[in-house]
From Swiss-Prot:
Its cofactor is Cu cation. One of its GO terms (biological process) is cellular response to iron ion starvation. Could be an iron transport multicopper oxidase, which is required for Fe(2+) high affinity uptake. May be required to oxidize Fe(2+) and release it from the transporter. Essential component of copper-dependent iron transport. Involved in meiotic prophase and synaptonemal complex (SC) assembly. This is Putative multicopper oxidase GMC1. Keywords: Copper, Ion transport, Iron, Iron transport, Meiosis, Metal-binding, Oxidoreductase, Repeat, Transport. InterPro entries: Cu-oxidase-like_N, Cu-oxidase_2nd, Cu-oxidase_C, Cu-oxidase_fam, Cu_oxidase_CS, Cu_oxidase_Cu_BS, Cupredoxin, CuRO_2_Fet3-like. The lineage of its organism: Eukaryota, Fungi, Dikarya, Ascomycota, Saccharomycotina.
Length: 608
């Protein structure tokens, strides 16, 4: 075999070519999307918001890959010109809009989609560009929705999927570990040490998206005006139904391929209020992802989702499976709205019960109202992303409750939720201030009897401790009581098991209870921490915290593209696409090539 050695003068040129090829390969695709939001009416004369003509109370699915750039232009036609010009603040808020990309972290603050805080409001007839690059570390199931008034329950929402090789490998490795097991037991899946030898595409895997939501027969703005913000308004208007994939009907079917061996279900609770319960009759659910975080595969029979939460589950089908009954319970004030849908294999003979009434949500196998914060654990790779320190520099405690005393009603015109005696609008004016790149424990104490779903913007959090209903508030200087005891027990559990705390962006906090969440403040800007029940948000239940920018690490504020175009059409030639921060994988490849070139050069000189 003839060996061709490179001359030294060839090495720099070869190196430049190879590095250019690598960087070009790492640059993702650019997706240019245009969303036109307008109001439409359903056959039932119910006013909804439609994005690009979609009428199922959900907008188009966005599907990208890690490292891709998204250029999304949103134009607002939600209200008529006459409605948009009304003096009422309630109308002004509803007639303006913005988009929040729920759970996408990291993302520069100017693209967080909070009108009047992180961006200008998008008024009637105006357009706004969201131009950013998905970070290489971001992967999984997310969703987008309006953060203006109560728009998203009317249809201003959709699913955002970020694909990546690590995700596909995680699914394939899990399949490799369970494919020869006849009966799957609840709990952590024992993963095979040998990695999968097949690509994910070699298996018969069918992916389906399942969106779950509550539903109100009346227009949300009417409900907000008449039943929530009035002087006698309450906190939780009764919803009338539920939606699965935007449909209110029961007994619908979802077709899958005849040769399907595994179902991969991305489930999103995109509702305004109700916790959702999900179950597949006779099948185990292998949980692979929670809120965009890949987890060590964990098997359950029934799972619940707080508003804003997402799970990806893998389902191993049986050889004789023709159809699967899907059971969904949408939690209302007293009980559940129960629906049953069916997955069926193409070509299968269907003889389905028309209106089966043998389901009690609370008697489903494995049913629990509790969060799986102790059970599920991020993969080793995911845990490295959250660079929290062992000991926080400070603990911030936030107590919230509902106030309907006369002084509150006189000041706000209605009863309001307050966090540490302040409403959300007051935190907008005067945020809680954190240091940059510091680790904090945030304690959220519910002095309210109801369960509340909380969501954090801009950061993931670790769940250090989570109380049960009735445990009471946790205060670090009160070292007694149920809350203190549970907190200590959770710390001992983490120390004894060596488990990493679960990482999420959304969580349910039980009534008269608490949560201790640990964050590292890496992203500068003003960020929200709020209840994701839309009515509660309108009633003041949330805070704003601010992370400062530092001169020595100012690039942290621009891990994504930084240009946006409020109200005016941009010149396409001037749109800047800034790549995400360089990832370790690229560095390793580049170093490897440098070493190989150096070895080649040494080899050449030795043989001269």
């Amino acid at each position: 075999m003839k060996v061709i050695l490179l001359k030294p003068v060839q090495l720099p040129m070869l190196l430049l070519i190879l590095l250019k090829f690598i960087m070009a390969a790492k640059e993702g695709k650019i997706h240019v999307l245009e969303f036109n939001a307008s109001s439409e009416y359903t056959l039932d004369k119910r006013r909804v918001i439609s994005i690009n003509g979609y009428s199922a109370t959900f907008g188009p699915e966005i599907r990208v890959k890690s490292g891709d750039t998204l250029n999304l232009k949103l134009t607002n036609w939600i209200c008529s010109e006459e409605e948009a010009s009304k003096d009422s603040d309630v109308w002004k808020d509803y007639c303006s809009t913005a988009l929040h990309f729920h759970g996408v972290v990291p993302l520069a603050n100017e693209f967080d989609g909070i009108p009047g805080l992180t961006q200008p409001t998008i008024g009637y007839g105006e357009s706004y560009w969201y131009n950013f690059t998905i970070d290489q570390s971001t992967c999984g199931t997310f969703w987008y929705h309006s953060h203006s008034s109560v728009q998203y329950g009317d249809g201003m929402r959709g699913v955002l999927i970020v694909e990546c090789d690590d995700y596909d490998n995680h699914v394939a490795n899990t399949i490799n570990s369970v494919r020869d097991i006849e009966t799957l037991d609840d709990g952590v899946v024992t993963m095979k040490k040998d990695k999968h030898t097949k690509e994910l595409t070699d298996y018969e895997v069918q992916e389906r998206i399942i969106t779950l939501s509550d539903w109100y027969t009346n227009w949300n703005l009417d409900i907000l005006n008449d039943k929530v913000l009035s002087s006698t308004g309450g906190t939780d208007p009764k919803f009338d139904g539920s939606l699965i994939n935007g449909k209110s009907s029961d007994g619908e079917t979802i077709k899958i391929g005849f040769n399907t061996e595994y179902l991969l279900l991305r489930i999103v609770n995109s509702g305004m209020s109700g916790t959702q319960v999900f179950h597949l009759d006779g099948f185990q659910l292998i949980v692979l992802e929670a809120d965009g975080i890949m987890i060590k595969p964990f098997i359950v029979q029934t799972i619940n989702l707080a508003v804003g939460q997402r799970y990806t589950i893998l389902v191993k089908l049986k050889s004789d499976t023709s159809f699967i009954r899907m059971i969904n319970g949408c939690n209302k004030m007293m009980g559940y709205i129960t629906k049953q849908w069916w997955f069926y294999k193409e070509g299968a003979h269907l003889d389905l019960p028309k209106n089966p009434n043998d389901v009690s949500i609370e008697h489903l196998p494995g049913f629990t109202k509790a969060e799986l914060y102790r059970d599920i654990e991020p993969t080793q790779e995911e845990n490295k992303k959250l660079r929290t320190k062992a000991d926080p520099v400070a603990v911030f405690e936030f107590d919230y409750a509902y106030y309907k005393d006369e002084s509150t009603k006189q000041k706000y015109g209605t009863g309001m939720y307050k966090v540490n005696e302040r409403t959300f609008s007051e935190y907008v004016k005067d945020p809680v201030r954190f240091g940059f790149n510091e680790t904090y424990d945030i304690v959220i104490n519910s002095l309210d009897h109801m369960r509340h779903p909380w969501h954090m913007h801009g950061h993931h959090f670790q769940i250090i401790s989570l109380g049960n209903k009735g445990d009471g508030p946790f205060h670090k200087d009160v070292q007694e009581g149920k809350a203190w005891s549970r907190y200590q027990n959770d710390l001992r559990h983490l120390a004894r098991t060596g488990k990493a705390p679960m990482v999420r962006d959304s969580i349910n906090i039980a009534g008269n209870s608490y949560a201790v969440l640990r964050i590292n403040t890496e992203m500068p800007g003003k960020w929200l921490l709020h209840c994701h029940v839309e009515w509660h948000m309108m009633k003041g239940l949330g805070i704003v915290f601010e992370v400062p920018t530092t001169t020595e690490d100012s690039t942290k504020q621009a891990t994504t593209a930084v240009l946006s175009y409020p109200t005016k059409e941009p010149d396409p030639n001037t749109v800047v696409h800034t790549a995400a921060l360089e990832q370790n994988k690229s560095k390793v490849i580049a170093v490897y090539i440098l070493i190989m070139c150096a070895v080649d050069a040494i080899f050449y000189w030795l043989l001269m």
